[in-house]
């Protein structure tokens, strides 16, 4: 398979120097040739576009190790004093972290939630959130699946969910503050890839003493990261269940993402609102929209679908920011498990050698990552000799069905955990 074209990163910062925001260095050994990395992890971007830090200017000499504090939305976002076994979101400082690009985060911070069986006393399950999600899987977006007696049974398993690298809910990302400048990274935050996000998950798991996982599962971007978590440590995960996630990003999705990033670059937060509206149209299905909105108008004559999209756009503005959204979308567009591994089949042979099982879950009517893309991954896994199965969620909800179809998800995950 060909590597996926990446979105060109907009490295200029309007109104102030990117250098004033820079808080990280570049690891020359890991970076190697920027031109070589640009041809694989960042195809489609010129080396001159990427810069020595891929979207940021390195700190001045002598300031290569600067600790960054987090810029939380509120003090309640992360309770760093909480017991990690109590189900509260906690933060963990994980030290120096080198990205694929060679850029360095001097002090990676991870926010996570752990529920259920204590670490070290039983099997652990990793749940990975999607694009704008958080570590609060058990208390929020997957709550119907996690808990005593649920399919992800906290009486039998420990359930851990970490906020993704580059996000804004406690883990290092664009809103993290540099203690020297007192300002957030913003656009100067270095580019991250899905593999960087997977490696950050392992950094946290290692720090917590979790060496093996019974299951890694996630939807959309979370499914992509779950795949890379498995490939990063073949043999450490028994089963991987990526939901609505292919082996590589599809070109239609890259095109949609590019439009969103262009909107943000040109219009800032107004662009983010429009980007979210566009994204929502890819998360649902034609059937869902027709059933909910056909023939409906608001009191002022506005079509109800338009009012709905405006509402969704405004909702995201209340809890997100343009730099974080850009960082996460760009990371998603680097997804390709076959990159620098000889293709998808060769990559999946690494998992087959350790007996890792794979369940690829497609969603009926998903226009973002179609069922054909998930089937293609399972065909590659079968060719690689993996114990692989395809399952499908039947729904009118489109891509976001992995956030609402609880009964079908329960059936699929029950099978995966056998």
PLM region descriptions:
Residues 2-13, 42, 51-124:
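Catalytic-loop region of hydrolases
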Residues 236-315:
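Alpha/beta-hydrolase-fold enzymes
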Residues 212-248:
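Conserved hydrolase catalytic core segment
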Residues 384-418:
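Catalytic active-site module of serine/aspartate enzymes centered on a nucleophile-bearing elbow/loop
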Residues 360-362:
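Short beta-strand/loop motif that positions the catalytic acidic residue
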Residues 184, 188, 195-214:
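Conserved acidic catalytic loop of the alpha/beta-hydrolase fold
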Residues 367-373:
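Conserved alpha/beta-hydrolase "acid-adjacent" motif
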Residues 113-178:
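N-terminal cap/lid subdomain of alpha/beta-hydrolase-fold enzymes
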């Amino acid at each position: 398979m060909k590597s996926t074209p990446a979105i060109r990163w907009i490295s200029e910062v309007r109104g102030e120097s990117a250098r004033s925001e820079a808080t990280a260095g570049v690891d020359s050994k890991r970076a190697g040739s920027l031109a070589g990395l640009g041809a694989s992890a960042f195809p489609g971007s010129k080396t001159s576009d990427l810069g020595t830090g891929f979207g940021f200017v390195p700190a001045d000499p002598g300031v290569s190790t600067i600790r960054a504090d987090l810029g939380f939305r509120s003090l309640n976002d992360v309770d760093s004093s909480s017991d990690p076994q109590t189900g509260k979101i906690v933060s963990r400082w994980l030290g120096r972290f080198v990205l694929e690009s060679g850029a360095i985060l001097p002090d990676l911070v991870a926010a996570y939630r752990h529920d259920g069986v204590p670490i070290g006393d039983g099997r652990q399950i990793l749940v990975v959130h999607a694009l704008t999600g958080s570590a609060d899987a058990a208390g929020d977006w997957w709550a119907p699946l996690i808990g005593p007696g649920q399919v992800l049974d906290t009486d039998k398993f420990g359930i851990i969910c970490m906020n993704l690298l580059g996000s804004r809910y406690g883990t290092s990302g664009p809103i993290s503050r540099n203690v020297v400048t007192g300002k957030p990274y913003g656009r100067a935050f270095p580019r991250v890839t899905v593999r960087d996000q997977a490696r950050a998950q392992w950094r946290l798991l290692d720090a917590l003493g979790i060496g093996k996982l019974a299951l890694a599962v996630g939807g959309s971007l979370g499914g992509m990261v779950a795949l890379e978590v498995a490939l990063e440590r073949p043999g450490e995960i028994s089963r991987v269940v990526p939901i609505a996630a292919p082996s590589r990003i599809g070109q239609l999705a890259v095109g949609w993402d590019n439009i969103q990033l262009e909107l943000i670059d040109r219009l800032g937060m107004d662009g983010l609102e429009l980007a979210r509206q566009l994204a929502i149209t890819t998360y649902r299905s034609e059937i869902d929209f027709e059933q909910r909105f056909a023939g409906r108008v608001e009191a002022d004559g506005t079509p109800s679908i338009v009012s709905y999209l405006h509402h969704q756009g405004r909702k995201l503005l209340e809890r997100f920011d343009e730099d974080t959204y850009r960082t996460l979308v760009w990371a998603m567009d680097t997804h390709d498990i076959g990159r620098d591994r000889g293709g998808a089949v060769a990559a999946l042979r690494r998992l087959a050698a350790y007996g890792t099982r794979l369940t690829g879950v497609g969603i009926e009517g998903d226009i973002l990552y179609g069922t054909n893309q998930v089937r293609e991954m399972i065909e590659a896994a079968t060719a690689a000799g993996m114990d692989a199965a395809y399952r499908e969620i039947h729904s009118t909800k489109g891509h976001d069905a992995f956030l609402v179809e609880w009964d079908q998800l329960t059936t699929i995950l029950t099978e995966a955990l056998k």
